[in-house]
From Swiss-Prot:
Top-level division of the source organism's lineage: Archaea
Coiled-coil features, chain-numbered ranges: none
Catalytic activity: a 2,3-bis-O-phytanyl-sn-glycerol 1-phospholipid + 8 A = a 2,3-bis-O-(geranylgeranyl)-sn-glycerol 1-phospholipid + 8 AH2; 2,3-bis-O-(phytanyl)-sn-glycerol 1-phosphate + 8 A = 2,3-bis-O-(geranylgeranyl)-sn-glycerol 1-phosphate + 8 AH2; CDP-2,3-bis-O-(geranylgeranyl)-sn-glycerol + 8 AH2 = CDP-2,3-bis-O-(phytanyl)-sn-glycerol + 8 A; archaetidylserine + 8 AH2 = 2,3-bis-O-phytanyl-sn-glycero-3-phospho-L-serine + 8 A
Extra remark beyond the main annotation: Reduction reaction proceeds via syn addition of hydrogen for double bonds.
Protein name stated in the entry: Digeranylgeranylglycerophospholipid reductase
GO process terms (BP): glycerophospholipid biosynthetic process; membrane lipid biosynthetic process
GO cellular component, as recorded: membrane
Gene3D superfamilies: D-Amino Acid Oxidase, subunit A, domain 2 (3.30.9.10), FAD/NAD(P)-binding domain (3.50.50.60)
Length: 395
């Protein structure tokens, strides 16, 4: 069995449905496929996202996939110093990813795209040396899907990007391992997300509590994947040390997060790679939903232009525009990440004491120049050659 579309999108996480919806809206035939039996499961995410994405990426603010509105964040240092960022208005939400992802695919379908769950991409189809489609299986039946443009939105492992000749390789140390419980938990302000830092708490990462209800939250951890201990070990250790019983677990999720850099060439002829498949993730906190939406938006713009003008070479502009915009920002964030990996617990204590909430937000977003300059004037920074050197490396 074979089908023909203008565009086939492999993967219905975040980036894939955004691309499929936008291209279908422009009047082109699109097929969005996902290997899972139910789009959106299992989740591999803490489910928090900025309130700004709904308007920016034209996504309905639908209470069906919003668990809780969030008004800020609270950061905790290794010794227990706290930094709170609290806003009058809603700053973010905790999603229900199992519903959210499915609704993104629904919006793509409503825009005109065909959507098929339980359809796994296996390989690319080549003709005269060019990629002309993909081999897949739909409900265990082999199919061939021919398309002018193929979009690899198939996650960190990205079979299709690799098969098409896009270099997506990254060494193991450029990934973090995550482990998360959705569980009943009390004693934390449910209007804030909570983050704990420390080299003994979460090496190269942090522990999070993202409230989904008054007494229910995603409680998870991210650590360097080459750590001799597992993420589960550190999370269970943190729960025990904080006298938090782990006896009311509603869901357990594990994941791998690319945090060490981004795929350089995002296009190979008529094949594009987006989202986690392109490692388009904020390396500071490991979140990638907003980044996937941005990449999907840029990619879909150039797909539409290339198809309208019947000039697939225009697809190369996706790589160019992404690196000039979000890629440039994320490279700055990666620079911060690499510095934070060298911080001692004493450093983390100091910075959480002296930074304001606005400062912390700027650093996490890559807009840190003025904040670093101010820190360089702090007496405890001036007295340490090592701290001075680390901070100056960011300027």
């Amino acid at each position: 069995m074979s089908w023909k579309y203008d565009v086939v999108v492999v993967g219905a996480g975040i980036a894939g449905p955004i691309v499929a919806r936008n291209v279908a809206r422009a009047g082109f035939s699109v097929l969005l496929i996902d290997k899972k039996w139910a789009i959106g499961t299992p989740k591999q995410c803490a489910e928090g996202i900025s309130i700004k994405v709904f308007e920016k990426y034209d996504i309905p603010y639908d209470k069906r996939f919003i668990n809780r509105e969030i008004y800020g964040a609270k950061l905790y240092s290794p010794s227990g110093y706290e930094l709170e960022m609290r806003y009058k208005d809603v700053s973010g939400v905790i999603l229900e990813r199992k519903v959210f992802d499915k609704m993104l695919a629904y919006y793509a379908a409503k825009a005109g795209a065909d959507v098929l769950a339980r359809t796994e991409a296996l390989d690319v189809i080549r003709k005269d040396g060019k990629v002309v489609g993909i081999k897949a299986k739909h409900e265990d039946e082999p199919i061939e899907i021919y398309a002018d443009v193929i979009v690899a939105a198939d996650g960190v492992e990205s079979t299709i990007a690799r098969k098409a000749g896009i270099n997506t390789y990254a060494p193991p140390h450029e990934f973090d391992s995550s482990y998360e419980y959705e569980m009943l938990i009390e004693g934390f302000d449910p209007d804030l997300i909570h983050l704990w830092f420390g080299n003994e708490i979460a090496p190269r990462g942090y522990v999070w509590v993202f409230p989904k209800d008054e007494d229910r939250a995603n409680v998870g951890i991210g650590i360097n994947s080459d750590n001799p201990q597992t993420a589960k070990y550190y999370l269970d250790k943190w729960l025990k040390e904080n006298n938090i019983p782990a006896k009311k677990l509603l869901e357990i999720n594990v994941g791998v997060v690319p945090v060490g850099g981004f795929v350089k060439e995002l296009v190979k002829n008529n094949v594009l790679v987006v989202g986690d498949a392109a490692r388009q993730v904020n390396p500071m906190h490991g979140g990638g939903m907003a980044e996937a939406m941005e990449a999907g938006t840029i990619a879909s713009k150039w797909i539409v232009k290339a198809l309208e003008e019947e000039n697939l070479s225009l697809l190369q502009n996706y790589t160019k525009e992404w690196w000039e915009t979000d890629g440039k920002r994320l490279e700055k964030v990666l620079k911060v990440r690499r510095v934070t990996e060298k911080l001692t617990d004493e450093d983390l204590d100091l910075f959480i004491q002296v930074l304001s909430g606005a400062d912390a937000e700027k650093i996490a977003g890559g807009d840190y120049g003025e904040v670093i300059k101010a820190l360089l004037k702090h007496p405890k920074v001036l007295m340490s050659k090592r701290r001075l050197s680390l901070l100056k490396s960011l300027l």
